[in-house]
């Protein structure tokens, strides 16, 4: 039995989790880890800005959506990746600190923008 961990519950992580769960035998575990417990459909943000949608219409709680498909969900930030040891550390330095072993890791966290590091920006 393998534990597949997907970091990120966004526009890449959610479909990746659904596809893995559909394709893999049930004895394998699929777990999604995200620092937040919701999915925001970012391409719809302009609709909120112009009043065509509300924030509540484009933000969904992730846990129930994944668990309904047999996918585990952990709403904690990943603070370290131990690639050699095949494990993640979640919430380092807090009472909720947790180690999460994996057989396979899929990183779908998206970009972290650093506009201030671009000359002239």
Model regions: which residues?
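FAD-binding core/adjacent interface of flavoenzyme oxidoreductases
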Residues: 71-121
